[in-house]
Amino acid sequence: MYMSTDEIRRAFLAFFESKGHQIVESSSLVPANDPTLLFTNAGMNQFKDCFLGSEKRNYTRATTAQRCVRAGGKHNDLENVGFTARHHTFFEMLGNFSFGDYFKQDAIKYAWEFLTERLELPADRLLVTVYETDDEAFEIWNKEMGIPADRIVRIGDNKGAPYASDNFWQMGDTGPCGPCTEIFYDHGEHIWGGRPGTPEEDGDRFIEIWNNVFMQFNRHADGTMEPLPKPSVDTGMGIERIAAIMQGVHSNYEIDIFQTLIKEAAKVIGYDDLSNQSLRVVADHIRSCSYLIVDGVMPSNEGRGYVLRRIIRRAVRHGNKLGAKGSYFYKLVGPLAEIMGTAGEELKKQQALVEKVLKIEEENFGRTLERGMAILNEALDNLEGTVLDGETVFKLYDTYGFPADLTNDVARERELTIDEDGFEKAMEEQRQRAREAGQFGTDYNAVIKVESETVFHGYDSTEAKASVVALFREGEEVDALSAGDDAILILDQTPFYAESGGQCGDAGIITVETGKFVVTDTHKIGNAIGHHGKLVEGVLSKADHAMAQVDETRRAAIILNHSATHLLHAALRQVLGEHVTQKGSLVKAENLRFDFSHLEAVKAEELRQVERIVNQQIRLNHTIETDLMDIDAAKEKGAMALFGEKYDDEVRVLSMGEFSTELCGGIHASSTGDIGLFKITSEGGIAAGIRRIEAVTGEAALDAIEAQQKAADKKLNEAASKAKQLEKEIQQLKDKLASQESASLINKVQEIAGTKVLVAQLDGAENKALRGMVDELKNQIGSGIIMLGNVSEGKVGLIAGVTKDLIGQVKAGELVNMVAQQVGGKGGGRPDMAQAGGTDAEALPNALASVEAWLTERL
């Protein structure tokens, strides 16, 4: 019976829903609240805390179709992708889970029923394995399911190491663990390979399709196994493998999804041979790259972003090997969204963003590839010997993004080789850096185990009576604290908000009859709330009655900033586009920090627009409403979920009028008007495709505006002062120039009726400078008449000077007025010195030329 991949996905979820399982959506490829994991790589990742007992949900049975990535960390399939039938960087894991509900019998029954009845697989093509000592599972398969004993294989420990077996699963060196049973499909004798547990088991005849893990024990540090009070079940079936069986093909790359992508890749590249392995690489990589970007990962040089960049560049390189010209990889996003069916809806919503990120990265790599080739050729030209060292190979790969296989190909063309061991050593160091990169902070759940649950009253109150249920000092549980002890205090109930969703934890004071504990921070520890701080006086013991009081002033500032982040998020989406999604936030009393997806710097005008919109919503004074509803109802209402957060089945939906509706478990103001004022203080990039805005609200916003105004006023005054000084210096230079020109004017003195006369036009000089020149010229000629004019900024300036021995014949005022009248002005002054102004600059030359005739009549 043929079934498409999408039909299998829907059939699986519907089957387990009919068995009382809650269908849970695939979680993000970026693990939520798990600092130990690079990418989600199994269906159970999102239920880890349920299996550990630190999280309780309103269901005990769940089923998922979980998207997974295995690349760049401990589970890394990247190097094998495209060259085997079943290795992928991206895959979907179908799973059903029981949290202390059903166990082996039902898990085995469900698996067998789905495979043989719903999918109609022939029972004689199925083979099962059990852990060597798991007689219970063997009996269920043999006696209840009717599987012949010769088709049930017991798998023991690897080389005798206790519990080191493919059929014994453990989360770590300690903690939940247990045996597992695996179901294999026999592709037939025409395919090489042996049964599980034989030397030929690595062949492709018998393929594992479903693994059922029975979490039955709690393993202690000394290796002893203690039965769990409520055993659980974790199962996983790769959708690509079961699709290959249902579609009658042997390789995963022959199923509908990959065949569609391979054909589309061949079309955009312009390549005809659909069997080429590079097309497989491209088809696989477009899935992991697209969904990593959907889940908030952007290409970068570290952590998750570095792994994404490696996958993109590997895909681009394989396209180039097939002759791809220009950018091609991003063109496969649309076909992928279509062929993924029900699992492609999120990708369709963000298709434009994914295409843009991939196109930019591909174009950048094209330039990097060219630089890398130039450096490689230079290194090979200067090589002493026949082996290119591993450090150079890694530098080309890591710094220039130059693929090692291409380095090897180029070297081989010159009959040279590369140091593969040295390269692998450097690569492993990089992989280790990638594993350790990211948000790998303190995991309090891994350090401290708390069985109790804290009831939170902080939505409605800032103080509460409580009892001390646990005390931890330096990670160890203690019965009492003494003054000066730093500790974590657990109460049965509390008004203190634990850090979550970007909102920092509350601070305050917890008092008991015999002491006072100052709380500096608050975190979630399982289902309890840990109050971090110091006992500043007295003693404090387990079971003490306490009064917990939150610092109200600090919290008030925090909630204003938190409410403002929701307005900011909505405003950014309105101004920049709906591709904007929150990638992180930090809400403190002092300010707020908001990280969001956007590929370029936000323009100044866009920031002003965002700021105006937020402040407009503040002035509208929307009531901030919080409603509790199930997750499906919240989505129907249009509520946005925040990046990296895990949500329970019942969620808090925060609404600010019709402007913003988001899921949020934080504490908020009563109305937007309480925020008062919003001011952005900075905007910048923190990673490829991720921008960060920092802002303040209320009094802090007013202070920021005043500080900006003071800074602007200071700069304005400094600029004005500098301009004034420059004007002064310019005038001094003009005066100096005019003074220098006055020396040359002596040569232009002429005589009229035996009297020395100087008439000249000196543009650019100020009137003050001209007066000085007239005085200087009078001294130089001893006896005579001087008439100077200038044009400055379109206006005419005139200065006339007459030595005292001649003022009986010619008065300076009469002379200057005669000239001024011709240039549209007038003036006056002493008989020996007079000045005037005018407006007709073009008439000045003729006006000065008339002086000679005027003086001739009077001398």
From Swiss-Prot:
UniProt name for this protein: Alanine--tRNA ligase
GO biological process: alanyl-tRNA aminoacylation; negative regulation of DNA-templated transcription
Cofactor(s) needed: Zn(2+)
Keyword annotations: Aminoacyl-tRNA synthetase, ATP-binding, Cytoplasm, Ligase, Metal-binding, Nucleotide-binding, Protein biosynthesis, RNA-binding, tRNA-binding, Zinc
Database matches in InterPro entries: aa-tRNA-synth_II/BPL/LPL (IPR045864), Ala-tRNA-lgiase_IIc (IPR002318), Ala-tRNA-ligase_IIc_anticod-bd (IPR018162), Ala-tRNA-synth_IIc_core (IPR018165), Ala-tRNA-synth_IIc_N (IPR018164), Ala-tRNA_ligase (IPR050058), Ala_tRNA_ligase_euk/bac (IPR023033), DHHA1_dom (IPR003156)
Domain remarks: Consists of three domains; the N-terminal catalytic domain, the editing domain and the C-terminal C-Ala domain. The editing domain removes incorrectly charged amino acids, while the C-Ala domain, along with tRNA(Ala), serves as a bridge to cooperatively bring together the editing and aminoacylation centers thus stimulating deacylation of misacylated tRNAs.
EC number: 6.1.1.7
Main localisation: cytoplasm
Gene that this sequence comes from: alaS
Catalytic activity from the UniProt record: tRNA(Ala) + L-alanine + ATP = L-alanyl-tRNA(Ala) + AMP + diphosphate
Annotated Zn(2+) binding sites: H562, H566, C664, H668
CDD domains per UniProt: AlaRS_core
Job of this protein: Catalyzes the attachment of alanine to tRNA(Ala) in a two-step reaction: alanine is first activated by ATP to form Ala-AMP and then transferred to the acceptor end of tRNA(Ala). Also edits incorrectly charged Ser-tRNA(Ala) and Gly-tRNA(Ala) via its editing domain.
Gene3D superfamilies linked to this entry: 2.40.30.130, 3.10.310.40, 3.30.54.20, Bira Bifunctional Protein, Domain 2, Threonyl-trna Synthetase, Chain A, domain 2
GO molecular function: alanine-tRNA ligase activity; aminoacyl-tRNA deacylase activity; ATP binding; tRNA binding; zinc ion binding
Any matching Pfam family: DHHA1
